[in-house]
Regions:
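Contiguous hydrophobic segments
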Residues: 7-26, 45-57, 128-160
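TOPRIM metal-binding catalytic domain and adjacent DNA-binding surface shared by DnaG-type primases
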Residues: 1-24, 164-179
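Phosphate-handling DNA/RNA-contact segment within nucleic-acid enzymes
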Residues: 14-104
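Generic structural signal for bulky hydrophobic/aromatic residues embedded
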Residues: 1-2, 31, 81, 151
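TOPRIM fold recognition
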Residues: 80-179
Length: 179
């Protein structure tokens, strides 16, 4: 999903079984010790479902800001894009955990929302803004995309395409100069 080694320390490879089938996936831990799991074929959770909270590059007592995401792939995309961000990263892991999310957001004075650009994301955003009117919605950054990860993927694709075009132009110029 366009992620780089910057975020690997936030993940763990989890091995699990569904019936007789043995699988593995990247895992992102939640605050109850459960895991959100993703691989090419599977999206689910292991043990208890809950929100995930990661404290990045700061002393939580001094820095009370948080960024909020629906899923952990979007959170990892944010960390990829902003590796020096200082604050909390809260991942809902399911919109059904909205009330749990709102309860946890009471610990922060500065809230930044990066929720999906779909109906459930809109509902969550409106509910959080109703409870925390000072929260800031940042979905305009990726307004043409479903979520922050899709935005990152399209940005990376554009960079790769430009690089390939430059390489092709260089090769063509090299060939022409040899003639």
């Amino acid at each position: 999903r366009g992620l780089w080694p910057t975020v690997y320390s936030l993940l763990k490879e989890e091995h699990f079984a569904i019936g007789e089938k043995k699988l593995y996936a990247i895992g992102f831990e939640n605050i109850s010790g459960g895991w959100e799991l993703r691989n090419q074929f599977y999206k689910g959770s292991l043990l208890k479902k809950d929100i995930s909270v990661v404290n990045l590059n700061n002393n939580l007592e001094k820095n009370k800001n948080v960024v909020v995401f629906e899923g952990f792939i979007d959170a990892l995309s944010f960390v990829e894009m902003k590796p020096f961000f200082r604050g909390g990263v809260l991942v809902m892991n399911s919109i059904s955990l909205l009330n749990r999310t709102k309860e946890h957001l009471k610990n922060y004075s500065e809230i930044h929302l990066f929720l999906d650009n779909d109906k459930p994301g809109e509902i969550c955003k409106n509910e959080i803004l109703k409870s925390f009117p000072e929260a800031k919605d940042h979905s305009e950054i990726y307004a043409l995309h479903k979520d922050l990860n899709d935005y990152l993927l399209s940005k990376n694709k554009t960079k790769i395409e430009k690089q390939q075009q430059q390489e092709q132009k260089f090769k063509q110029e090299q060939q022409e100069s040899e003639i």
